[in-house]
Amino acid sequence: SALWGLSLTISMLVVAVISPFLGALADYSGRKKTLLFVMTAISIVFTGLLFLVEKGDIFIGMLFFIIAEIGYRSGQVFYNSLLVDVADKDEIAKVSGNGWAIGSVGGIVCLLVVLVLIQLNPGNPFYIRLSLVITAVFYALFAIPAFLWIKEQHRPQKRDGKSLFKVAIER
């Protein structure tokens, strides 16, 4: 559990450092939905790859988890930036809350599925590892509506000749 905490700390520190750049990228690129897709795909792929991690594969397990978590948390930057494209200013909180609620329902359903699977096969590490593939599949399925239904309004802000890095630092 200490190594899981360390992995989470590393991933959150990376996201804290890169978030200003990601925010600038969201605001100035006009590609929020594409960037959300990339980060979501990274998170899904590396969550699924955790299936390959077996007992004793500590480094690779931590690495896959860190990358999956960075993809997930970085994706939230782009998810949040899309709120202005799907809701009026007075509806943003409601739309955001509903989005999180739907995602949470998917997470709870997934948890129940893998919990039953693991309980029916106690002590079998294969089913514990398989739960990560199932989680990746649920994640992908529950992400599909966002990519199908969200209509991004390409409104990249002007950088006035500044690099994204400089814009991110100056904000």
What are these regions (language model features)?
Residues 26-41:
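Cytoplasmic membrane-interface "Motif A"-like loop-to-helix N-cap segments
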Residues 37-56:
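C-terminal ends and interior cores of transmembrane alpha-helices
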Residues 64-101:
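Cytoplasmic helix-loop-helix junction between adjacent transmembrane helices
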